C-alpha cells in the first residue's frame, strides 16, 4: 500500500500543536498539513466540562489550564484573534492561610508576604527576605543559557526544598514556598532542581508573578466559556480533514535530508517532509526514534517529570464567602500536629463564572491520588468548612475533579519539571532531531509552562519548519529566538566543573600574618614591653612617624 504523504505532520492537538498548524497554513496555504492526536478530543492540558450549578442548571468550568496574565502577550493576541473574551479573577476580600501552624489566619494583602497584621513581624520579614532573594537569583538567569550564570552548577545540584531550608528562618516561610511549588508545578519542592525553578521564574517575570492574581500575576483573568474553546476554535478553522483523533504515535523514523516516517499505534504509517512533536516532554520519551535521540535529549525526556495535581471544582447555591467578606482564596500546608495526617487543599480561588454560577476551584495534594472519588470529595468539603464555615457544606451542590495523572497521552499536569542534576540536558529541549521539531509550553522562552508559552512554542516550531522547507521569505525571525535556525544562535554553555589553578590568597595572608606577629614579638622583646604594649607600641610608632615625620622618642 502507498504511504500517505504530507508536507508537515504535527503531533498533538493542544494549543501548541494547533497553533503551529495554523501558523503554517496562514503563511503558506498550499502546504499539506495534518495534525495527529492520541486522545479522543482536542485541547491537550485544557479541558472544559459542564458541572451542575445553582437553580438546577449547569455551567462550564475549566479542569485544566484556565488563567491568563496581563503580560502573556502571545495568548492575549490569540484570544483577540479568536474573539474570546476575558473577565477578572475575583480577589476582593480577606484571604485564608494555614502556614507554620494549625491555626487559620486571614489577611487582606495580595500575598501573606505583606500581611503584617496576621503574621508576626519576624515571619513577614522572613517572607519578604526569601522572596527578594529568589527574585534576585532568578534575574541572573539567561533563559537561553542557564549555565552562563556562575552559580548555576550549585543551583542545579540542590532541590528547591534544600535551598528553602538553608535560607528560611520560619516554618511559615518554608510552608509558603512548598505551597507555591505545589500550585505552580504540581510537584514537591524536594524533587525539583533549584536552577529549573529560577529559570521558570525568569521566564514568567518573577516568582511573585507566578503566584499572584493581581498586577502582572499569572492568575489575573479567566476565559469566558472556558479555555478549551481555544483549541476547539483552532481545530474548527483547520477543518476536520486536517485533524485526526485517536491517532497516537508509536515510532518516528527520520534522516538528514530525507523524509520522516511516522508509525501510529494502530499500525498505520504516514510520511512527511517535516514533523513537529507538540506533546509534553514525558510523552516524547514514550516515542521510539530511529536513529535514536542524542544522549542529553534522551536523558532530558527520562528525567522531566509531570506534575501530579488533582484539580477540583465545588459549586454552591450562593457565593456565601463573598457575603462574609472573603475572596475565596486559600493557601494551606495541609499539615497538622498528628504525624502523617494531611488535609487535602493546597490552594483555592473563587471560580464563580461569568454567568454568575457560584463555585470554588482548587488543587489537591498528590498524596490523595489513591483515595476514591467520594473520599476526596468528602475531605475537600470538610476542609472548605474549616476555612469558610458550615455554609461550605449547607450550600453544597456538586463536586467535580480531574486527576491528570490518569489522563492518557498526558501523564500529569500542569507542567513537566526537571529533577536536580539534569539541567544540562534541558539545554537541548528545543534542538531538532534531523527532520523533527519540538514544541510545547515547556520549550517556550516566555511564560514557559503556561498557555501563552504554548502559543509561542507553536509559532517557533512553525517558523523553523518554514525555514527548513526553504520558504524563508515567509519566516518571522523574531520567533526563531532560541532556535538552531536563529542568526545569533549559540549552543548553551555546559555545566563547568573545571579545576581552578589560581593561587589561593590564603597563602599570602598566612605569610604576612606570621611576619606581622613575629615583628611585634621581636620589638616587644627588645624594649621589654608589657603584653598590651607589645601589641600596640609598634602601631603607635608607625602612626607617630607617619603623622609627624619624626622618629619615636627613646
Regions found by a protein language model. Name each.
Residues 4-35:
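N-terminal Rossmann-like FAD-binding beta1-loop-alpha1 element of flavoenzymes
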Residues 19, 27, 259, 308, ...:
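Conserved flavin/dinucleotide-binding core of flavoenzymes
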Residues 25-54:
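Glycine-rich FAD pyrophosphate-binding loop
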Residues 56-139, 149-150:
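Dinucleotide-binding Rossmann-like beta1-alpha1 core, especially the glycine-rich loop
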Residues 58-68, 144-154, 216-224, 297-305, ...:
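Active-site rim elements
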Residues 139-248, 255-260, 278, 283, ...:
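Active-site/ligand-binding neighborhood in enzyme catalytic cores
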Residues 247-248, 253-328:
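Central helical "cap/lid" subdomain
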Amino acid at each position: 500500500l502507498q504511504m500517505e504523504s504530507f508536507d508537515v505532520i504535527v503531533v498533538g492537538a493542544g494549543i501548541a500543536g494547533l497553533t503551529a498548524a495554523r501558523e503554517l497554513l496562514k503563511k503558506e496555504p498550499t502546504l499539506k498539513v495534518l495534525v495527529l492526536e492520541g486522545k479522543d478530543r482536542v485541547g491537550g492540558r485544557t479541558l472544559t466540562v459542564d458541572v451542575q450549578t445553582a437553580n438546577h442548571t449547569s455551567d462550564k468550568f475549566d479542569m485544566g489550564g484556565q488563567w491568563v496574565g496581563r503580560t502573556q502577550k502571545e495568548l492575549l493576541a490569540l484570544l483577540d484573534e479568536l474573539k474570546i473574551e476575558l473577565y477578572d479573577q475575583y480577589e476582593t476580600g480577606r484571604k485564608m492561610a494555614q502556614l507554620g501552624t494549625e491555626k487559620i489566619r486571614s489577611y487582606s494583602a495580595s500575598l501573606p508576604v505583606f500581611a503584617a497584621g496576621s503574621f508576626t513581624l519576624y515571619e513577614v520579614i522572613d517572607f519578604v527576605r526569601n522572596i527578594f532573594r529568589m527574585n534576585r537569583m532568578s534575574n541572573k538567569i539567561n533563559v537561553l543559557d542557564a549555565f552562563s550564570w556562575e552559580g548555576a552548577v550549585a543551583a542545579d545540584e540542590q532541590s528547591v526544598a534544600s535551598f528553602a531550608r538553608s535560607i528560611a528562618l520560619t516554618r511559615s516561610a518554608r510552608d509558603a514556598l512548598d505551597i507555591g511549588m505545589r500550585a505552580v508545578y504540581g510537584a514537591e519542592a524536594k524533587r525539583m532542581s533549584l536552577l529549573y525553578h529560577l529559570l521558570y521564574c525568569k521566564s514568567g517575570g518573577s516568582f511573585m508573578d507566578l503566584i499572584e492574581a493581581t498586577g502582572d500575576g499569572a492568575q489575573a483573568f479567566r476565559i469566558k466559556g472556558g479555555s478549551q474553546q481555544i483549541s476547539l476554535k483552532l481545530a474548527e478553522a483547520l477543518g476536520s480533514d486536517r485533524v485526526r483523533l485517536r491517532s497516537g504515535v508509536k515510532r518516528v523514523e527520520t534522516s538528514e535530508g530525507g523524509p520522516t516516517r511516522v508509525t501510529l499505534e494502530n499500525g498505520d504509517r504516514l510520511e512527511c517532509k517535516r514533523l513537529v512533536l507538540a506533546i509534553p516532554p514525558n510523552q516524547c520519551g514514550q516515542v521510539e526514534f530511529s536513529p535514536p535521540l542524542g544522549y542529553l535529549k534522551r536523558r532530558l525526556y527520562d528525567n522531566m517529570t509531570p506534575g501530579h495535581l488533582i484539580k477540583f471544582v465545588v459549586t454552591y447555591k450562593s457565593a456565601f464567602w463573598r457575603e462574609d467578606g472573603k475572596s475565596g482564596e486559600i493557601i494551606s500546608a495541609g499539615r497538622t500536629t498528628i504525624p502523617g495526617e494531611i488535609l487535602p487543599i493546597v490552594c483555592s480561588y473563587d471560580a464563580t463564572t461569568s454567568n454568575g454560577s457560584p463555585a470554588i476551584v482548587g488543587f489537591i495534594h498528590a498524596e490523595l491520588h489513591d483515595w476514591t472519588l467520594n473520599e476526596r470529595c468528602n475531605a475537600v468539603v470538610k476542609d472548605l468548612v474549616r476555612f469558610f464555615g458550615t455554609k461550605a457544606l449547607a450550600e453544597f451542590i456538586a463536586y467535580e475533579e480531574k486527576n491528570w495523572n490518569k489522563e492518557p497521552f498526558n501523564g500529569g499536569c500542569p507542567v513537566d519539571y526537571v529533577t536536580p542534576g539534569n539541567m544540562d540536558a534541558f539545554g537541548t529541549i528545543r534542538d531538532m532531531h534531523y527532520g523533527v521539531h519540538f514544541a510545547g509550553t515547556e520549550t517556550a522562552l516566555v511564560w514557559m509552562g503556561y498557555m501563552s508559552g504554548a502559543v509561542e512554542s507553536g509559532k517557533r516550531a512553525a517558523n523553523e519548519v518554514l525555514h527548513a522547507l526553504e520558504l524563508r521569505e515567509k519566516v518571522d525571525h523574531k520567533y526563531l529566538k532560541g532556535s538552531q535556525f536563529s542568526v545569533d544562535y549559540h549552543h548553551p554553555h555546559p555545566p563547568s566543573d573545571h579545576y581552578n589553578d589560581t593561587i589561593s590568597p590564603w597563602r599570602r595572608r598566612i605569610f604576612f600574618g606570621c611576619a606581622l606577629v613575629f615583628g611585634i614579638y621581636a620589638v616587644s622583646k627588645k624594649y621589654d614591653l608589657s603584653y598590651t604594649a607589645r601589641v600596640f607600641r609598634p602601631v603607635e610608632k608607625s602612626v607617630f612617624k607617619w603623622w609627624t615625620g619624626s622618629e619615636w622618642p627613646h
